[in-house]
């Protein structure tokens, strides 16, 4: 299992309503990029062996300073980055410095990444490949299994990296089916919605954590059971 920690940004253009709202709530509460790195440090101290991926947008990193960000991200124990608004044409900005710092730079592939562009996008990818199962914003639709299977196969012909599928996965059953087509499933919006609902109900941090843990355990159990069928 891996944990993806979102770094809040005021204009999260690739995210759906749930994560957009969460990002704005975090900013309103005073969360910053530095604060996100402090959370990463706390996580790493408690869970030394679980891979931790930082996901976000380039603007806050640019303002923070790329060199300082990579230094602090490494010190915090991050294993990789998913920066959704930096295409390979902009590798000099963050991808190249990340790789020099031994930080995985994870690429996103969408259903519209076709032809010669696929190997170009994946040329400097590391860690794993994040396949976006639908075109558009996160957490709003679910793609047909056949189209996902075909896309994963197409990616695997170009790269030996694990292919993990995300966007629109909301149930344990969906997670198990999608994970069986590749190397894993990413669930974000559904988790964020549980946190938002708990917040609206004024539940304690412990109660919220338990609800999230129960949900993510159901995902992991379903994926594991499906693999052993």
Question: Model segments located where?
Answer:
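Active-site-adjacent beta->alpha loops and helix N-cap segments on the catalytic face
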Residues: 10-21, 31-41, 62-68, 83-100, ...
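Glycine-enriched alpha-helix->loop->beta-strand junction motifs that scaffold or abut catalytic
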Residues: 73-79, 99-106, 123-129, 181-185
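Histidine/lysine/aspartate-rich catalytic loop segments that bind and position anionic ligands
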Residues: 102-139
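Short, electropositive alpha-helical surface patch
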Residues: 58-76, 181-189
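Alpha-helix-loop-beta-strand connector modules within alpha/beta enzyme cores
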Residues: 17-53, 96-110, 146-163, 210-228
């Amino acid at each position: 299992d891996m944990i993806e920690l979102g770094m809040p940004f005021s204009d999260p253009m690739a995210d759906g309503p749930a994560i957009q709202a969460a990002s704005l709530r975090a900013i309103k509460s005073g969360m910053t990029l530095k604060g996100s790195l402090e959370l990463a440090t706390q996580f790493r101290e408690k869970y030394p062996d679980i891979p931790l991926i930082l996901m976000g947008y380039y603007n806050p990193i640019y303002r923070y300073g790329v060199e300082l960000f990579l230094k602090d991200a490494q010190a915090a124990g991050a294993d990789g980055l998913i920066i959704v608004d930096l295409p390979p044409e902009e590798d000099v900005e963050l991808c190249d410095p990340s790789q020099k710092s031994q930080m995985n730079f994870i690429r996103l592939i969408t259903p519209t990444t076709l032809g010669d562009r696929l190997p170009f996008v994946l040329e400097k990818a590391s860690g794993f490949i994040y396949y976006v199962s639908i075109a558009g914003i996160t957490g709003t639709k679910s793609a047909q299994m056949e189209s996902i299977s075909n896309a994963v196969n197409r990616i695997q012909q170009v790269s030996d990296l694990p292919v993990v599928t995300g966007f629109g996965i909301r149930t344990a059953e969906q997670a198990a089916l999608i994970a069986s087509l590749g190397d894993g499933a990413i669930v974000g919006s559904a988790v964020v919605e549980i946190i938002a609902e708990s917040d609206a109900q004024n539940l304690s941090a412990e109660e919220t954590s338990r609800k999230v843990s129960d949900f993510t355990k159901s995902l992991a159990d379903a994926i594991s059971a499906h693999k052993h069928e």
